[in-house]
């Protein structure tokens, strides 16, 4: 009873928010009438409300041994300066080339038939009178059959290819880099937003200062947009709410 009451209150609350959401959406659309979508300003990604520092399991830190009269600095990669990204704020080019193909085709068929018959000629001297009175015969028989079949098929084909520059926002204690990249491209009245973030090993950054997406751990890749086309392809708030609460 209490669960049903809470569900009713939640439904009424969502319905009450429909006019507010519709008004906010209308105001946002009216503010962009005759103008393309506004591009966001360049800001520090670590100052965003959604930014969270990355923490990962790390090995214990060990102090480097002192080497007297050595020409090599501890942790150096080469005698000459390495031009690859290595510090917070350095840029690195991220290459995303995703080509996924998946196909599943499953089929299940089950068929079972059972038939049993047995008689009771003498039941404690009654000689089957009880059975014959119930079934009209001196024996019992049972029969059952079941048949079921199911098929399922899934086919997916996705391709994403892009290049964008990212920034090292964090250097983890084990030396790995947290890289974040964002790019906005506006074409007519549609704004495309590209975003990539993940953890990269320094040795996976090539000599031309690039790294591929398959070398990024915990990679998060987003490709979306906003504008006239996105508004036409997105269901209205009322339709989304009704799809969420209607059971049929």
From Swiss-Prot:
Signal peptide: 1-23
Family annotation (InterPro entries): Flag_Lring
Subcellular location: Cell outer membrane; Bacterial flagellum basal body
One Gene Ontology CC term in the entry: bacterial-type flagellum basal body, distal rod, L ring
HAMAP family: FlgH (MF_00415)
UniProt xrefs under PANTHER family: FLAGELLAR L-RING PROTEIN
Protein name: Flagellar L-ring protein
Native source species: Gluconobacter oxydans (strain 621H) (Gluconobacter suboxydans)
């Amino acid at each position: 009873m209490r669960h049903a009451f809470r569900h009713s209150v939640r439904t009424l609350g969502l319905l009450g928010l429909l006019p507010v959401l519709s008004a906010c959406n209308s105001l946002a659309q009216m503010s962009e009438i005759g103008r393309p979508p506004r591009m966001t300003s360049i800001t520090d990604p670590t100052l965003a409300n959604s930014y969270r520092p990355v923490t990962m399991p790390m090995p214990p830190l060990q102090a480097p041994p002192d080497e007297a009269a050595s020409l090599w600095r501890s942790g150096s990669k080469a005698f000459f300066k390495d031009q690859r990204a290595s510090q917070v704020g350095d840029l690195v080019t991220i290459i995303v080339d995703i080509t996924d193909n998946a196909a599943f085709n499953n089929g299940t068929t089950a068929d079972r038939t059972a038939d049993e018959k047995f008689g009771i000629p003498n039941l404690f001297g009654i000689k089957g009178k009880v059975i014959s009175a119930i079934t009209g015969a001196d024996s019992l028989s049972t029969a059952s059959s079941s048949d079921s079949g199911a098929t399922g098929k899934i086919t997916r084909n996705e391709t994403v290819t892009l290049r964008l520059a990212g920034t090292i926002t964090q250097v983890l204690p084990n030396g790995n880099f947290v890289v974040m990249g964002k790019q906005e491209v506006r074409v007519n009245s549609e704004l495309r937003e590209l975003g990539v973030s993940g953890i990269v090993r320094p040795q996976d950054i090539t000599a031309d200062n690039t790294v591929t997406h398959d070398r990024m751990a915990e990679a998060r890749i987003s490709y979306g947009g906003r504008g006239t086309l996105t508004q036409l392809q997105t269901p209205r708030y009322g339709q989304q709410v009704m799809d969420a609460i209607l059971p049929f």
